[in-house]
C-alpha cells in the first residue's frame, strides 16, 4: 500500500509492479483528516495484513492509531530514515512542534514489533528520544556494479541530487558559486530533484540576483545512472542526514565528492577520499580545489 501521491512514490510503485507485487494506492488528504483514517482503516480491516511496515512519521502515527482498533492486530514494523526533528524549519515554533511530535511518536513506537534505523547515527538519535526502544540497524545498500571511471569532458560538471528544501543546503551551494574564487573557473552545475514551486522560485531568484550562469534544474529524474555519468563532481551540502545514500551512490560511480563536515557523511568521506567543508567559504574552496585536482589528474 502506497499512500502519499508524489513523483517519488510513483517510481517506487513501478519497481514493485515489475516484480509482480500488487499495489493499492490510498489517495486522499494527509494525516489529520478523517477521510485518510477511514480509507486506511477499511483497507487494513478488509485485507487483514500480517505485517504493516511504515516509513514516515505521518504513516507511523496513523498506523499506531488504526492498529489499536483492529480485531486482528498486525505486526507493525517501523523504519526510521532520518533524524526527523533535526531538519531545518523557518521558525522556532515549527521546530518546537516537530520536537514535541517526535517525542510523542517515540512513545507510540514502543508498541511496534520492530524498529529499524538506517544508520548508527539514526539509532543513537532514536534512543535519545526514548531509551526504552530496541532499535535494529539495517543500512541502505547500493549496487556496486555501477562503479564507473573518471573521464575528461569538455567542461567540468558539478551535480547535486536530492529533494530540494532548506535542509539540503542548496542555498549555501548557490552562495558558494558567487565567490571570487570560483568566478574565473569554467564549470556548470546540474541540480536534480523535486521541491515546492515556492522554494524553486527562491533558488532561481538567488541565481538571477547573483548573475550566476550555467545552472540547470533537471527536476525529478528516473535515470540516476545517466545523471552520475554526466557529472564529474558531486556536491552534497546537506545540514542533516540519516545516512546520505546518494553520497554512497556518487562514490560508487567514482565521482569526486564534496560534503559537509558532519556525521554520518564523515563516516564515508575524509580528506583522503574527498572534500569536507564547514561553511560557505569552505565549500567554495573545496569546489575550486576539486576542479583543479580533476583537471590536473585527467589527461
Regions picked out by a protein language model, each given a short descriptive name:
Residues 41, 96-114:
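Membrane-proximal helix-turn-helix segments that form the acceptor-binding/catalytic region
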Residues 2, 256-259:
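Short hydrophobic beta-strand element within catalytic cores of glycosyltransferases
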Residues 54-60, 80:
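Short His-centered aromatic/hydrophobic patch
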Residues 121, 141:
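Carbohydrate-associated surface elements
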Residues 220, 239:
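Aromatic "clamp/platform" in nucleotide-sugar-dependent glycosyltransferases that forms part
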Residues 156, 160-179, 198-202:
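A conserved mid-protein helix/loop that constitutes part of the nucleotide-sugar donor-binding site
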Residues 271-282, 290-298:
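Conserved acidic donor-binding segment of nucleotide-sugar-dependent glycosyltransferases
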Residues 202-219:
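Nucleotide-activated donor-binding/catalytic signature segment of Leloir-type glycosyltransferases, i.e.
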Amino acid at each position: 500500500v502506497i499512500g502519499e501521491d508524489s513523483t517519488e512514490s510513483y517510481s517506487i510503485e513501478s519497481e514493485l509492479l515489475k516484480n509482480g507485487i500488487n499495489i493499492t494506492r490510498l489517495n486522499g488528504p494527509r494525516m489529520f483528516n478523517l477521510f485518510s483514517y477511514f480509507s486506511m482503516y477499511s483497507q487494513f480491516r478488509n485485507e487483514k495484513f500480517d505485517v504493516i511496515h511504515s516509513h514516515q512519521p505521518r504513516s507511523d502515527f496513523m498506523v499506531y492509531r488504526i492498529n489499536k482498533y483492529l480485531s486482528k492486530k498486525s505486526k507493525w514494523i517501523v523504519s526510521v530514515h532520518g533524524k526527523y526533528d533535526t531538519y531545518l524549519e523557518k521558525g522556532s515554533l515549527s521546530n518546537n512542534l516537530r520536537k514535541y511530535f517526535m517525542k510523542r511518536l517515540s512513545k507510540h513506537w514502543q508498541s511496534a514489533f520492530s524498529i529499524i534505523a538506517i544508520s548508527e547515527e539514526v539509532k543513537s538519535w532514536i534512543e535519545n528520544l526514548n531509551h526504552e526502544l530496541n532499535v535494529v540497524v539495517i543500512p541502505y545498500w547500493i549496487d556496486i556494479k555501477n562503479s564507473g571511471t573518471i573521464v575528461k569532458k569538455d567542461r567540468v560538471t558539478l551535480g547535486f541530487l536530492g529533494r530540494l528544501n532548506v535542509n539540503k543546503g542548496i542555498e549555501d551551494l548557490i552562495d558558494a558559486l558567487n565567490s571570487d574564487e570560483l568566478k574565473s573557473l569554467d564549470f556548470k552545475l546540474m541540480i536534480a530533484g523535486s521541491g515546492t514551486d515556492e522554494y524553486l522560485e527562491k533558488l532561481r531568484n538567488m541565481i538571477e540576483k547573483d548573475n550566476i550562469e550555467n545552472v540547470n534544474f533537471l527536476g525529478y529524474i528516473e535515470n540516476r545512472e545517466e545523471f552520475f555519468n554526466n557529472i564529474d563532481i558531486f556536491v552534497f551540502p546537506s545540514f542533516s542526514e540519516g545516512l546520505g545514500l546518494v553520497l554512497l551512490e556518487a562514490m560508487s560511480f567514482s565521482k569526486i565528492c564534496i560534503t559537509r563536515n558532519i556525521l554520518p557523511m564523515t563516516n564515508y568521506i575524509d580528506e583522503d577520499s574527498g572534500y569536507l567543508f564547514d561553511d560557505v567559504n569552505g565549500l567554495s574552496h573545496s569546489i575550486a580545489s576539486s576542479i583543479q585536482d580533476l583537471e590536473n589528474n585527467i589527461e
